[in-house]
């Protein structure tokens, strides 16, 4: 993710803090800095001008001659761009100035007409890559003013890595919250006062589905599709977003500003009540990319009078898109279930800035602020008529109060943190907390899904205390020469199976809940907190699924049919034998023998295996084992057994 210093300064006063110190702070707070760019453009003698006259060049048909008022004087300038007219407000490079790459601008003769400077494009000023024509500024911009004052020309851009559990940091506000604690500077309130002046035409509701907690909308009437404000275009371009027009740019701006995805509909193409539901099997929707998508019952959609008009949180529909002729808008701001959005975006290969933020978890209480922010930015651009927000909310979210002993901090960190530091740090992070009787109680804010256990808060305190402030200590442990009975048995099993041409595999412990229930329905799965892959939300209760998947993958990729074994942990939600409060885990041995095995010596004819091949191997491993018939759904009634050893 890319963040801009001047943009961060909207939320926290850091303009006077050296960019090197901010880089150090970001790394200390756990953000990997992937790149840094210091923007120091030279805008000497570049001012704001107004085009007074335009006429044809007497000796050239591909350029025009203009007269431009720069406040103190009117200059005659020859220009090759055709995207502006009389009264356009533009940046002007006067004689004795420099533009991008140190290119010098002076008076020059162009086919018999003296050109006193240059009217500039965004690309020529190194703002963003736009070669479509001259950069047009707001009509309200003061003529003759220094162009460098139009926006913060000296700036720093960081590209940082954000871990999957910190979806709240996928915005400038989120990063500013972290820096707020580090630099002990408050977050700016940026309160917005709005005065709606029209009534809502379209009704909205969040539907009966549990996958949409809130759905809000606001309507705008009789506006103009134009270029967005220069500051917005500069900021979006800097963070890698393509600028299009004011509507699209302002929705993208809110996304990168506070982390709330928005979507714009052409209100004149809507006819009834906007709602949210799961799609019907094989229902279709034509999306903005003009592709007709066949949907499944797992896809969450937005409907108008129950007809699909958008893929919730992923992509809008073609039939309700905003075009250059759009005059009335409906802006959507919603909270959609992150797992549902992830499944749809991955299945359809439609991954966007919005879907990524929904997947990682957005603030469930910021939807109204997203609409306010959009209206505020739009109002700055032009006079608009807008409604108050239409709100449909289920209020299904709440964060539990978590309590733990203060001594747990010392036991884990080895550092005695003072009460004042603990409370002050949590307050700056807007985490509600109390400290009494050596117990800390806290409730995480609506944007922090990663604070679910005491260890999460302790990690947060360690981060803001500063890992560089911890004293180095040598680890204390015992050096045992003997490997122990378990490892002796493990080595014996591994050596024996390897001698019988088995390949050992090591697979991840994550799986989906349904895979567990196939082979071990009697065991309850352990749910993974905040899984990186939402389809791998459980810990395995058996090794059979992973062995089958390994065989399938290897056979499909190299056509080898091999024998495999795995010795690894399996888990269930029972009580651990030694440790309380953690799930039960046990080592398990899994074997897989194909009916037709690739000959490891010749890679030629297959070796034929059957149930006796497997029982012979088991008897070698465990000579006193007993086989009892297993009757269970999903298992072959003649070839399934329970193995018993010493009863």
Show which residues each predicted segment covers.
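Phosphate-backbone binding interfaces of nucleic-acid-interacting proteins
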Residues: 1-193, 330, 347-348, 353, ...
């Amino acid at each position: 993710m890319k963040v801009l210093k001047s943009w961060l300064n909207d939320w926290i006063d850091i303009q006077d803090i050296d960019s090197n110190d901010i880089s150090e702070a970001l790394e200390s707070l756990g953000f990997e800095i992937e790149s840094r760019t210091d923007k120091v453009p030279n805008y000497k003698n570049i001012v704001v001008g107004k085009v007074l006259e335009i006429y044809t060049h007497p000796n050239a048909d591909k350029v025009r001659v203009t007269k431009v008022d720069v406040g103190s004087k009117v200059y005659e300038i020859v220009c090759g761009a055709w995207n502006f007219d009389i009264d356009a407000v533009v940046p002007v490079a006067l004689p004795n100035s420099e533009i991008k790459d140190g290119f010098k601008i002076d008076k020059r003769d162009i086919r018999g007409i003296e050109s006193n400077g240059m009217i500039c494009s965004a690309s020529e000023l190194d703002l963003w890559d736009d070669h479509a024509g001259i950069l047009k500024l707001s009509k309200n911009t003061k003529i003759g003013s220094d162009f460098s004052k139009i926006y913060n020309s000296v700036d720093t851009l960081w590209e940082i890595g954000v871990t999957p559990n910190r979806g709240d940091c996928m915005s400038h506000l989120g990063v500013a919250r972290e820096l707020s604690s580090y630099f002990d500077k408050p977050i700016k309130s940026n309160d917005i006062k709005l005065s709606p002046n029209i009534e809502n035409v379209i009704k909205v509701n969040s539907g009966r589905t549990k996958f949409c907690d809130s759905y809000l909308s606001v309507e705008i009437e009789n506006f103009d599709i134009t270029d967005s404000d220069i500051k917005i275009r500069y900021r979006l371009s800097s963070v890698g977003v393509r600028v299009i027009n004011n509507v699209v740019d302002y929705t993208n701006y809110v996304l990168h500003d506070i982390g709330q995805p928005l979507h714009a509909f052409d209100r004149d193409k809507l006819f009834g009540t906007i709602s949210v539901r799961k799609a019907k099997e094989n229902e279709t929707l034509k999306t903005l990319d003009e592709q007709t998508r066949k949907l499944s019952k797992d896809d969450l959609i937005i409907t108008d009078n129950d007809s699909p008009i958008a893929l919730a949180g992923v992509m809008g529909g073609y039939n309700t898109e905003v075009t250059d002729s759009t005059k009335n808008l409906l802006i959507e701001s919603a909270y959609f279930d992150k797992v549902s959005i992830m499944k749809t975006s991955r299945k359809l290969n439609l991954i966007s800035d919005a879907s990524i933020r929904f997947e990682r978890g957005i603030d469930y209480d910021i939807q109204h602020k997203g609409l306010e922010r959009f209206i505020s930015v739009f109002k700055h651009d032009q006079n608009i008529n807008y409604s108050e927000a239409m709100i449909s909310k289920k209020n299904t979210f709440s964060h539990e109060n978590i309590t733990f002993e203060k001594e747990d901090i010392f036991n884990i960190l080895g550092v005695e943190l003072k009460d004042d530091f603990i409370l002050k740090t949590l307050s700056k992070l807007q985490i509600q907390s109390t400290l009494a009787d050596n117990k800390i109680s806290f409730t995480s804010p609506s944007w922090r899904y990663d604070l679910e256990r005491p260890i999460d808060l302790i990690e947060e305190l360690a981060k803001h205390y500063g890992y560089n402030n911890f004293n180095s200590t040598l680890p204390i442990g015992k050096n045992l020469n003997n490997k122990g009975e378990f490892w002796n048995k493990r080595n014996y099993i591994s050596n024996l199976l390897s001698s019988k041409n088995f390949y050992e595999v090591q697979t991840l412990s994550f799986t989906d809940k349904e895979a567990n229930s196939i082979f071990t329905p009697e065991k309850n799965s352990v749910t993974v907190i905040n899984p990186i892959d939402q389809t791998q939300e459980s810990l395995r209760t058996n090794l059979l699924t992973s062995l089958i998947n390994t065989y399938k993958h290897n056979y499909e990729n190299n056509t080898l049919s091999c024998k495999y074994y795995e010795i690894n942990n399996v888990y269930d939600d029972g009580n651990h034998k030694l440790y309380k409060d953690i799930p039960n885990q046990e080592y398990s041995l899994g074997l897989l023998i194909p009916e037709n095995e690739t000959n490891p010596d010749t890679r030629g004819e297959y070796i034929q295996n059957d149930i006796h091949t497997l029982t012979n191997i088991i008897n070698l491993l465990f000579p006193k084992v007993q086989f009892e018939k297993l009757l269970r759904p999903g298992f072959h009634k003649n070839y399934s057994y329970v193995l018993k050893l010493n009863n």
